[in-house]
Amino acid sequence: MALLNKLLCFALVFMIFGEFVTPDCYEDWSRCTPGTSFLTGILWKDCHSRCKELGHRGGRCVDSPSKHCPGVLKNNKQCHCY
């Protein structure tokens, strides 16, 4: 039930803010983005696990200022595999 509530909240946020977000925002988004990090482990794997799944030794979140959506994706981070 808690998962369903989180998914409904996530969908509602996307519907409300979707109008303010350009399609290019997706290029800046990652599993490390602070605004959606609460869904890590529920809807997607964390950075380290995803990189291992892709055949890398691991991964970590690094600062990556948003190029396309600086007003929406503040303090943006992206997953970098090593």
Swiss-Prot record:
The keyword Metal-binding is annotated on this UniProt entry: no
Cell compartment(s), UniProt: Secreted
Disulfide bonds: C25-C32, C47-C51, C61-C69, C79-C81
Entry-linked Pfam families: Macin
Residues in the signal sequence: 1-23
Swiss-Prot/TrEMBL GO biological process terms: defense response
Keyword entries, A-Z: Antimicrobial, Disulfide bond, Secreted, Signal
GO cellular component: extracellular region
Top-level taxon in the UniProt lineage: Eukaryota
Keyword Chloroplast: no
Family: Belongs to the macin family.
Name of the protein this chain belongs to: Neuromacin
Annotated organism of origin: Hirudo medicinalis (Medicinal leech)
Lineage: Eukaryota, Metazoa, Spiralia, Lophotrochozoa, Annelida
